[in-house]
C-alpha cells in the first residue's frame, strides 16, 4: 500500500478555525494566526502540545474519516494513550484549545488571508531511503 506524502500549509485563518484537511487531497492547513498567538503567549511545551494535537486530528481526517465527532474522540483517545490524561494535548483534544488557552478568545477575527507558506520537507515518507 502506498500513500502520497502529506503537505503542510500555514495560513492566517479565522480564529475559530484551528486547521483543516482539504478533503480528497494530501494537504493540511494550520492556522498560522493561532500558532503565533500560542508561541508568543505560552510555553514551548504548550505550543508543541497544540501542534501535536492539531496534526494528529487532521492526519486522521487525511485517512478519509470525515465525521468530526469521531475524529475528535479518536484524537483524544490517541493523545490520552500516548501522553496521559492530564497532558496539555489530551486536554485540548478533550475540551478544545479555546478551553485550555482562553486568551485565544481575545483575538477574534473572521479574516482569511490569501498569503500562505508551504512547509518544506514536512512528510518525507514518499522519499527513498537510498539516494
Q: What label would you give each PLM region?
A:
Residues 1-18, 22-37, 66-131:
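Metalloprotease/metallohydrolase-associated module, dominated by Zn2+-dependent proteases
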Residues 29-56:
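Short acidic, glycine/tyrosine-flanked loop/strand segments centered on an H-E-D-like triad
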Residues 49-65, 72:
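Active-site recognition of the HExxH zinc-binding catalytic motif
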